[in-house]
Amino acid sequence: MILSFHIEYRTSWGEEVRVLGSILELGNNQPGKAIPLQTVDGIHWTLDADIQAPKNGIVQYSYHIYRDGKDTRTEWNSLPRTLYVSADKKKVYRLQDCWKNLPEQQYFYTSAFTESLLAHPERNTAPKSHKKGLLIKAYAPCIDNDHCLGICGNQKVLGDWDADKAVLMSDANFPEWQVEVDASKISFPLEYKFILYNKKERRAVAWENNPNRYMADPQIGANETLAVSYTHLRAHETGAYL
């Protein structure tokens, strides 16, 4: 299995980006064993890591900046990046990441909210995997257990802009939300928005107040999942993060 890491980070002279993760091939969370990424311009950093799928099907990882072999900066890691992987040894995951800064309202990510006030005691299962997949991930902590995050867009698989038919996201890693869409059913370019969905009433109650999100054809391979992540969705006037 290949994990293909991609991240933009403008480094200074002498700095490098490394990735550290929960599996042997990514350093077993030991800072001295973080794996360097490669770059040709000091901005776009990449790494293809050949790994064995862990027994629990979960890979957690984070990005770090190193200078002279020392970890000088770490992205916000209170909620580690979490990837649920399939057991397919030939699977490729292309991880299109951005650096995670400290969220403006960090307190929403504390246990007082995620495990009490806005707790999700009965979590969904991990997102269903597809042979050719588009995995969309987003952080949205201000959503209570009666609601969930969804995605609606210009594709039948995303509801054809009918919010009540939106694809709903998993809270398996709450307050991060994830869903993997069958990319073979998408006709690019793709346009979509996040929606807030009331599970009890079975209807959408709010759209994100932003322009449509747009994705040109990313040329996803036959046995590849492209993962894109959004950090800290903006707050909607209802109080939910949208």
Tell me what each language-model feature is:
Residues 231-238:
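Conserved small/polar residues in nucleotide/adenosyl-binding loops
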Residues 2-6, 46-50, 92, 135-137, ...:
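Ser/Thr- (and often Asn-) enriched beta-sheet segments in non-cytosolic proteins
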Residues 1-9, 107-142:
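Basic K/R-rich, polyanion-interacting modules in nucleoproteins and related proteins
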Residues 98-108:
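Intrinsically disordered, low-complexity glycine/proline-rich and charged
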Residues 85-97, 217-228:
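Low-complexity, Pro/Ser/Thr- and charge-rich linker/hinge segments at domain boundaries
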Residues 57-61, 188-192:
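Exposed beta-strand face motif in extracellular beta-rich ectodomains
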Residues 10-56, 66-87, 142-187, 197-220:
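Aromatic-rich carbohydrate-binding modules that target alpha-glucans
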